[in-house]
Amino acid sequence: MKLTAVLMVAVLVLTACQLITANECSRKGEWCGLESVLCCNGGSWNCWFVCTA
């Protein structure tokens, strides 16, 4: 049961992080995959893991 709770919290944190990152990227007029440290380090897949990288 504890493991499930930990996983749920991790997913919520990562999702919030993804949304914040996406907002930050669009504010700067950049998109996932373009060269920018905040906007995903050059790979659209990395965009979703920018907070853990």
Curated annotation (Swiss-Prot):
Disulfide bonding pattern of the chain: 25-40, 32-47, 39-51
GO terms assigned for molecular function: toxin activity
Location(s) in or outside the cell: Secreted
Main subcellular location: secreted
Alphabetically ordered keywords of this record: Disulfide bond, Knottin, Neurotoxin, Secreted, Signal, Toxin
One GO cellular component term: extracellular region
Signal peptide as annotated in the record: 1-22
Protein's name according to its UniProt entry: Conotoxin Cal6.23
